[in-house]
Amino acid sequence: MSELRKIEGALISVFDKDNLEPIVRELNRLGVTIYSTGGTQAFIEELGISVVPVEDLTSYPSILGGRVKTLHPKVFGGILGRRELQSDIAQLEQYEIPALDLVIVDLYPFEKTVASGASHADIIEKIDIGGISLIRAAAKNHKDVVIVPSKEQYPTLLSLLKDKQGNTDLEDRKALAKAAFNVSSHYDTAIFNYFNNDEEPVLKQSIQSSKVLRYGENPHQKGIFYGKLEDMFEQVQGKELSYNNLLDVDAAVSLIAEFKDTTFAILKHNNACGVATRPTVLEAWKVALAGDPVSAFGGVLITNAKIDAVSAEEISKLFFEVVIAPAYEPAALEILKAKKNRIILIQKPVTLSKKTVRTALNGVLEQDKDSVMETASDLTPVTDRKPTEQEIADLLFAAKICKHTKSNTIVFAKDNTLISSGTGQTSRVDALRQAVVKANEFGFSLQGASMASDAFFPFPDCVELAKNAGITAVIQPGGSIKDQESIDYCNKNGVAMVMTGIRHFKH
């Protein structure tokens, strides 16, 4: 233990008073002189504990509607004064500035105010000035001062007060200083991002919540998730989500968001291997599973409707890692919980991020999330035969899945059902061949089915192979210098083709 310091004077200035009482009572027990302002001062006085108003220390009242309370040399001098420097001690004595050994702050809730949809004027008033200054000053002088920058550090402080009787060593203070600069940098980043509003190409992120995962993509890799999963899901049971689980859950949530009617999807390694839209969850599940029961084994399941007990009985026949739904019947939960390792998630209503960020080389790539999804009005027929209403429905269904599948990708669909797909291939024609093979493997007829491609056809061989397999309608973005060759082939063979002008690469 090194450079032991005893807390004798404390400044407390917090926005949220929750959980403050035990700390104040412990400080009072130890005989610490407490200084405070405004609402915090009133809170402490209501506890029957003596407190010195900061105004008595500075001889200045709170001014400008509370904008200036603690910004004064008699406050910051007591925080920044170096206890081992005789000249600092002399000045503190000369100007009658008491040493402040502990500073407790809880900042104005800037991020919550922004998220609430408050007016610009209200948001500006929630930019903390005095609090952030106190945090930085106390953290800078952590050699002598204990800084508690948020409620997250209250348990640590209580432990120091009870177990060490208000004494702290340098290691204690340094750890709290690190937390303080984390709080202050996060706060300033949030303010910058509010003002920037994506106007300038500047990437600043600060995510305070993190969770160490069992491992990364493979057991020899370390994995960490930064964010608050509890804002998106309630985990009913199961082991902790792994790195790969999280990637699959992310893909599943993004895919299911495309569908309004009752839909069930099964994913494996970020790609859909079964998707169906039907009147009920049970029907959608059965049809989705039939699409590729082999790949579905050990997959991630998601639906946008409540899972009932009958559906749960059928779902439970499959080994799966994760199931996600907005709600479950109580009986359905009991059925699904029979296998203890199953991860059962209740998805909460939440707005998904509008950006995607990933590392590349020695930097970071950021882009807008691919939030565009074509509707019937976006389709441009380019062939003599126009698609039927059912074909249009199947084309749009296939396009939704195609958008969320690794490139190069081809998707076959019919009657609101994913029949098969070819994914992650280095050539488009190979993706098409893969999709044909998988459809045949599971006994699906492609006669009258529709096909979606995430990008244009560089040659007419794709539409030729598709027609020979039974495909009657095609959706693709177009843009190839050989588009006309594909169109000509479709015209000669009665295939309907529509173009969207929108590519959906996914890497």
What are these regions (language model features)?
Residues 1-57:
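N-terminal glycine-/serine-/threonine-rich phosphate-binding loop
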Residues 39-109:
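Glycine-rich nucleotide/cofactor/substrate-binding loop typically near the N-terminus or early
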Residues 83-132, 136-138, 380, 384-389:
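Active-site/ligand-binding-proximal alpha/beta "capping" segment
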Residues 152-160, 164-335, 339-369, 391-398, ...:
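Active-site loops and adjacent core secondary-structure elements that bind or stabilize anionic groups
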Residues 273-293, 417-463:
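Glycine- and Gly-Pro-enriched alpha-helical subdomains that act as flexible
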Residues 301-302, 308-317, 442-483:
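Cysteine/selenocysteine-centered motifs that mediate thiol-based redox chemistry or coordinate metal-sulfur cofactors
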Residues 320-342, 464-505:
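C-terminal binding/interaction regions
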